[in-house]
């Protein structure tokens, strides 16, 4: 009798582990495809606008107008409380909600900034883009808050990997940036 209980327990554990493995395999594949595709498009557009600006140096004269355009976009999207990458990290630590409208806003505003010669890095944009899309995928799949946080990290890794072409470094970077300031 005890052997049968032990056998049931063993098979239940195997089933649960296989279910978790399959669930995260599908979710990470979806996040990788969607976020990776969007981030690859972002990287191509970024290269295009940077090359265009390099060959048309007069574009920098319109940088103040580009800044006004970006402020106008933030106003249209009704996005007043932009904390940048910190918002993505706060979502992972369960402090704030991550809006999906952050993704197109970051995509467009970073391209405008680069087109007119502004100073903006790709790292923050990658993390915000990937985190925002990953969080939205988690909502669409109706995941728990804890699972959505993991999907946000998957999205951050996928975006970072697609933009910089470094998949292993992207995973390590996402785990590292989430653990900053946490002592074990």
Where are the regions that the model predicts?
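Alpha-helical transmembrane segments and immediately membrane-proximal extracytoplasmic
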Residues: 1-184
